Amino acid sequence: MDAKKGSGEPEFFSEYGDASRYEVTEVVGKGSYGVVAAAVDTHTGGRVAIKKINDVFEHISDATRILREIKLLRLLRHPDIVEIKHIMLPPSRREFRDIYIIFELMESDLHQVIKANDDLTPEHHQFFLYQLLRGMKYIHAASVFHRDLKPKNILANADCKVKICDFGLARVSFDDTPSAIFWTDYVATRWYRAPELCGSFFSKYTPAIDIWSVGCIFAEMLMGKPLFPGKNVVHQLDLMTDLLGSPSGETISRIRNEKARRYLGNMRKKPRVPFSQKFPGADPMALHLLERLLAFDPKDRPTAAEALTDPYFTGLANSEREPIAQPISKLEFEFERRKLAKDDVRELIYREILEYHPQMMQKYLRGGDQSNFLYPSGVDRFKRQFAHLEEGVAQGDKTSPQLRQHVSLPRERVVRNGDEPDPTADYCIKLHVGEQPGHSSVTDGLNKPLLSARNFLKSESIGASQCVVIKEKREKDEESMSEYMNEAADGVPHKIAQLKT
């Protein structure tokens, strides 16, 4: 070991200091794509979620999806989008198979919140929707279409903070991108799919496809169940027109799919159902906005920015405090335009991982080939911890984690310029007051589960992971945003209501 230390590799190996930084405590979720574990950040004492993605390169299509999501989550840094904190450096540049991604912690997802709570207040609905639209405003400003918005892809915590995740189906729109190529792999969840996607209705798609999904999610908050649970495409269109009425002749004439055009043209005329009848007891202003979001014709839907100016958000929205992203460079997604081999995707993912290892990035850019490491990496140690804990889970035991074996002193990760505190951290609606530090679940006044810490997504999405939360103490937020959010919270004490205790 001493001889190796003298070879100049300690500085290289010191990038693996994060191997000692995270101590895996338990496996908390398993899916077809990997394992999610809770871990402790030994530098801060806070807990994080670590997602291990197995055999990333077994299928190139899956590896490309992971590459796309890692890249987008790096480029789209916003309080309402789930954040990758770190990615472990693999032990070999050209031979690694698994990826370990460290995420911020969220307790549950919007699907579970809606399912477990039949007494969410209008204030909850408003705040959830505001954050969702604010995140989509940022995403769309970057010319990104999410394409798979649904409650399970909206993570949530006990403070009613929500964050958009699962960008595996997302695409960046460029002016010269052929729409036929752009949308050929669209397979998003049918219940939240815009009508123009149900039958390839229109030749040019817009961010309005995401706005429709936001409307479906908002309606589900109000109803407590999905609005359009279609069994197939035809049934989906029937459910839409049952509520919204038959589309206009002008809308039908612009549909490019002949079968869909003929089906809607021959459909019996259906009257529009008043939303006040479909959603009895709902806030009239909420229903007015919902009608705009669920316009059958995409040109009639508001943009996310326009929706945020709706009177429904009076006293809450402030366009000056809503960040706007710059369009993403076409070069970032050049790989979408060519056929990739397994080694191509591996190299591209490795390049993304280096974004979280600044010193290694410099060596990489200088042409230093570090394909064979002299020391076991943090990933190697995590493999042992995961294997140990998974074995206990398989046997039904409450397995204790292996003791860490320090091979070097922990070193602080180099902070990137984009590492900033969440400017909305102080603006929250408590779902429950009195939770003891360290508890892993939240209950409402009826002592029923509110946000279960065991509701983990089984998604191939790298961001679809939830773990037990012990919210880390954040540094002071940016002054302007903090003041704004505190003013909003102080100014509407009853509006930001708590559930009954």
Curated annotation (Swiss-Prot):
Dually phosphorylated on Thr-184 and Tyr-186, which activates the enzyme. InterPro entries: Kinase-like_dom_sf, MAP_kinase, MAP_kinase_CS, Prot_kinase_dom, Protein_kinase_ATP_BS. The keyword Nucleotide-binding applies. The modification Phosphothreonine is found at residue 184. The active site is at residue 148. It comes from the Eukaryota. It catalyses: L-seryl-[protein] + ATP = O-phospho-L-seryl-[protein] + ADP + H(+); L-threonyl-[protein] + ATP = O-phospho-L-threonyl-[protein] + ADP + H(+). GO terms for molecular function: ATP binding; MAP kinase activity; protein serine kinase activity; protein serine/threonine kinase activity. GO terms for cellular component: cytoplasm; nucleus. Keywords: ATP-binding, Kinase, Nucleotide-binding, Phosphoprotein, Serine/threonine-protein kinase, Transferase. Activated by threonine and tyrosine phosphorylation. ATP binds at residues 28-36, 51. The keyword tRNA processing does not apply. Pfam families: Pkinase. A motif (TXY) lies at residues 184-186. One of its GO terms (biological process) is intracellular signal transduction. The TXY motif contains the threonine and tyrosine residues whose phosphorylation activates the MAP kinases. This is Mitogen-activated protein kinase 16. It comes from Oryza sativa subsp. japonica (Rice).
